[in-house]
Curated annotation (Swiss-Prot):
Residues 25-181 form the PPIase cyclophilin-type domain. GO terms for biological process: apoptotic process; protein folding. The lineage of its organism: Eukaryota, Fungi, Dikarya, Ascomycota, Saccharomycotina. This is Peptidyl-prolyl cis-trans isomerase C, mitochondrial. Residues 1-20 form a transit peptide. Keywords: Isomerase, Mitochondrion, Rotamase, Transit peptide. It catalyses: [protein]-peptidylproline (omega=180) = [protein]-peptidylproline (omega=0). Signal peptide: none annotated. PROSITE patterns: CSA_PPIASE_1, CSA_PPIASE_2. Belongs to the cyclophilin-type PPIase family.
Length: 182
């Protein structure tokens, strides 16, 4: 009985370990001063195409990515948004699949702070822009694809949020100085 229990626990651990998503990071800076690291785990078992887009943009392996890109929209008690790899002002950005790609699914919900979700201009318009929730945002369910979550550095997300305004225009220049895969 004891041996069987250990084997069952071992299987549970190995199954959950195999479901862990890829891990990526940002090292953001405020007005040129690095403020720490944000680490994410991607839901590549739920939304593999969306997660791969973000991972590849973190590494810059396609020739462009998030390094040097600002958080251009920050609204306290809502979210921080970035990822405009073209224009850097919120009006650009492209995916690794071309200009835009379709919403993969809406399985994951905006039910807590620290979620990574695709910013878009309506259905099936995902590019490179993303946001990180700072509170639960259930009104976004079914409209934006959740594809990962913050695993370390939520204090850094909250620090970035503190530079936000009701209009979304940041009160400081906040840039992703480094990004990559862990």
């Amino acid at each position: 009985m004891f041996k069987r229990s250990i084997i069952q626990q071992s299987r549970l651990f190995s199954n959950s370990a195999s479901r862990l998503g890829k891990k990526v990071f940002f090292d953001p800076a405020v007005n040129g001063t690095k403020i720490g690291r944000i680490e994410f785990e991607l839901y590549d078992n739920v939304v593999p195409k969306t997660a791969e887009n973000f991972r590849a943009l973190c590494t810059g392996e396609k020739g462009w990515g998030y390094k040097g890109v600002p958080f251009h929209r920050i609204i306290p008690d809502f979210m921080i948004q970035g990822g405009d790899t073209d224009l850097t002002n919120g009006f650009g950005g492209k995916s690794i699949y071309g200009s835009k790609f379709a919403d993969e699914n809406f399985v994951k919900k905006h039910d807590k702070a620290g979620l990574l979700s695709m910013a878009n201009a309506g259905p099936n318009t995902n590019g490179s822009q993303f946001f990180i929730t700072t509170v639960p945002c259930p009104w976004l369910d079914g409209k934006h694809v959740v594809f990962g979550e913050v695993t370390k550095g939520m204090d850094i997300v909250k620090a970035i949020e503190s530079y936000g305004t009701a209009s979304g225009k940041p009160r400081a220049e906040i840039v992703i100085e480094e990004a990559g895969e862990l």
